[in-house]
């Protein structure tokens, strides 16, 4: 304001003089008045607050009111209006004030405001302005390890309490212009003084290995679709590791700028950042670290002078290894239908493992069980087992592994897009009941989706579908507990001619099928009746000279076999004038059985059965007679 006083005193002459050209940015202007030569010419705006744009017109009018009796050249009304209306349209604003305000904004953004910074720093002792910035760390080529130079020194303070690493938070980076503006803003509110701390430093330097930082990520897609297992599973897996090399703060900083509401965290030493944040403060400048046994002392200040530095103590992390996934996670199904999610990890010390399903922790229960197994050295295997897998088990699973050196996550995305083909719970087998009168082919299969059962018999190299639920054959299907189905084929009075061979049952659902195969063999016990040749129907003449039909059967048997003939009406036949039975012993256990039918008529047509039985077993053979002609009445020769 003092430097602008001459300008206001002669403002009347400046505006009235015809030789007045313009005002320049750097306060240089052309005028014929000699008094103006006393106005200081500067290359930059002077410090201090810029006068209001209304000051010049107001001073000008007041001066004219006081000297109205003197001959004075007044400015016109339009000219006065141009200086007194809104600032952005006034001539004074456009010529001088607007230009100076633009310059002031640029300088404020670069160096801070004149009022807040320059005046405040005149009163503030230099030692009370403390700033900290972490030195960028250089990385070696093709190496994930981080190295930093540190000074060795002796620790002079006593044991200090530790602070948990959970209070650590990274703040980020700022450009140079943003840092200058941030320092100016913070310094405006800093109003406390703290004495400096003393320290001792050694000149010996040593290069110290800190550890591994950074993150690795792997993605793999795996699909398990085994036809013999009860599920088709689509599993997407990924690994993420984040190993943080941090130094835990032991002593709270003493000299720090105040009032930054963005964080209430304690400081953390992160080797890859230029700033760190600590409890309501942001600090950034330069620092040096000194190793004292297993503790690091950080010297912080605005200059390299030792008297301007403050000491902060950080506890070095113990030796060990952050969690690392050496291979891809695995998802597999067991024969019992359970699902296992397994991830492999290298860590030291032993990590803590937690499993999450849709971001909710999975607790050990009847269906879920978690296990961590040591595979030797620092290798571990974390397994989550899911029993009785159901539709509701699909979703996102996460294995969270953490130890003091870092943490890692293995992600599983389980999709049950469809269930696999049925599986055997009980293998196929053949049994009998009702004293061998019923043959049963049965098995049990498990299927989540309801299956269909189709029974077939191989005939002549092909497959013939069996008609179920007939008088002699019956198919059985029954649902039991746990999605288990029982299926059986029951055959009454099975015979070698009809029922020997291979039977197939196909179990099918929307995802696949299962085939059960049965082989039926009829084994004749020693001495049991068996047929030695193909039965024959012969046309001949009886002993009385009458036309006759003879059913001739050859068989072998021991232990006095008995022969029984069954008529087409399923009745036991007896001898009569028209029916004669003959049995001839041919030796070596071979026999011939004959049924002679004389005076045969059309009504004698039908299927006749010869049953041969002894203590070792029995055998049956059927013969079909077809006689053409009128159906005359004849006597019934069967037993009542």
Curated annotation (Swiss-Prot):
Residues 323-417, 422-521, 529-626 form the Ig-like C2-type domain. It is found in: Cytoplasm. Residues 154-204 are annotated as: Disordered. Disulfide bonds join 343-399. Residues 189-201 have a biased composition (Polar residues). The keyword Transmembrane does not apply. PROSITE patterns: IG_LIKE. Residues 154-186 have a biased composition (Basic and acidic residues). One of its GO terms (biological process) is cell adhesion. Its main location: cytoplasm. Expressed throughout development from the 1.5 stage of embryogenesis in bodywall muscles. InterPro entries: Ig-like_dom, Ig-like_dom_sf, Ig-like_fold, Ig_I-set, Ig_sub, Ig_sub2. It comes from the Eukaryota. Keywords: Cytoplasm, Disulfide bond, Immunoglobulin domain, Repeat. The initiator methionine of isoform b is removed. Pfam families: I-set. GO terms for cellular component: cytoplasm. Stabilizes the attachment of the myofilament lattice to the muscle cell membrane. Isoform b is sufficient for wild-type function. PANTHER family: FI24025P1, PROTEIN SIDEKICK. This is Disorganized muscle protein 1. It comes from Caenorhabditis elegans.
């Amino acid at each position: 304001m003092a430097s602008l006083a001459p300008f206001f005193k002669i403002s009347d002459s400046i505006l009235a003089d015809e030789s007045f050209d313009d005002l320049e940015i750097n306060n240089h202007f052309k005028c014929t008045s000699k008094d103006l030569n006393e106005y200081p010419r500067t290359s930059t705006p002077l410090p201090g607050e810029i006068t209001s744009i209304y000051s010049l017109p107001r001073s000008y009018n007041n001066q004219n009111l006081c000297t109205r009796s003197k001959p004075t050249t007044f400015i016109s009304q339009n000219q006065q209006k141009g200086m007194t209306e809104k600032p952005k349209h006034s001539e004074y604003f456009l010529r001088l004030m607007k230009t100076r305000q633009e310059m002031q904004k640029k300088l404020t953004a670069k160096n801070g405001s004149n009022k807040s910074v320059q005046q405040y720093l005149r009163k503030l002792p230099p030692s009370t302005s403390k700033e900290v910035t972490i030195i960028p760390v250089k990385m070696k080529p093709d190496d994930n390890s981080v190295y930093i130079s540190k000074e060795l020194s002796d620790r002079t303070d006593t044991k200090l309490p530790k602070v948990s690493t959970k209070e650590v938070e990274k703040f980020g980076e700022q450009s140079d212009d943003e840092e200058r503006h941030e320092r100016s803003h913070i310094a405006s509110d800093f109003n406390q003084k703290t004495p400096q701390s003393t320290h001792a430093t050694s000149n010996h330097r040593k290069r110290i290995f800190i550890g591994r930082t950074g993150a690795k990520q792997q993605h793999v897609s795996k699909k398990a679709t085994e036809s013999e297992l009860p599920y088709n599973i689509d599993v997407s897996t990924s690994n993420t590791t984040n190993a943080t090399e941090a130094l835990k703060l032991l002593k709270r900083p003493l000299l720090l700028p105040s009032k930054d509401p963005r964080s209430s965290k304690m400081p953390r030493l992160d080797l890859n950042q230029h700033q760190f944040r600590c409890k309501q403060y942001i600090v950034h400048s330069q620092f040096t670290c000194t190793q004292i046994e297993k503790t690091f002392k950080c010297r912080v200040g605005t200059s390299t002078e030792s008297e301007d530095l403050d000491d902060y103590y950080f506890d070095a992390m113990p030796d060990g290894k952050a969690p690392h996934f050496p291979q891809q996670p695995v998802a597999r199904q067991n024969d019992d239908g359970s699902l296992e999610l397994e991830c492999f990890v290298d860590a030291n010390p032993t990590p803590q493992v937690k499993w999450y399903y849709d971001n909710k922790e999975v607790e050990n229960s009847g269906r879920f069980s978690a296990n961590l197994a040591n595979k030797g050295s620092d290798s571990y295997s974390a397994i989550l087992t899911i029993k009785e897998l159901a539709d509701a088990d699909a979703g996102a699973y996460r294995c969270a592994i953490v130890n003091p050196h870092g943490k890692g996550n293995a992600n599983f995305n389980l999709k049950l897009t469809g269930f696999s083909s049925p599986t055997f719970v009980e293998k196929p087998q053949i049994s009998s009941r009702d004293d061998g009168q019923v043959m049963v082919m049965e098995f049990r299969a498990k299927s989540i989706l309801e299956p269909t059962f189709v029974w077939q018999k191989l005939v002549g190299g092909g497959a013939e579908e069996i008609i179920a639920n007939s008088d002699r054959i019956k198919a059985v299907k029954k649902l039991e507990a746990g999605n288990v189905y029982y299926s059986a084929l029951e055959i009454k009075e099975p015979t070698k001619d009809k029922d020997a061979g291979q039977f197939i049952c196909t179990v099918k659902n929307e995802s696949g099928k299962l085939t059960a195969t049965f082989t039926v063999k009829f084994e004749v016990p020693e001495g049991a009746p068996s047929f030695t040749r193909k039965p024959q129907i012969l046309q001949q003449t009886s002993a009385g000279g009458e036309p006759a039909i003879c059913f001739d059967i050859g068989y072998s048997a021991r232990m006095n076999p008995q022969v029984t003939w069954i008529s087409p009406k399923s009745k036991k036949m007896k001898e009569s004038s028209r029916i004669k039975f003959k049995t001839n012993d041919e030796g070596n256990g071979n026999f011939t059985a004959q049924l002679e039918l004389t005076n045969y008529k059309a009504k004698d047509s039908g299927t006749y059965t010869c049953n041969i039985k002894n203590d070792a077993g029995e055998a049956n053979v059927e013969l079909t007679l077809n006689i053409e002609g009128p159906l005359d009445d004849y006597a019934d020769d069967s037993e009542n």
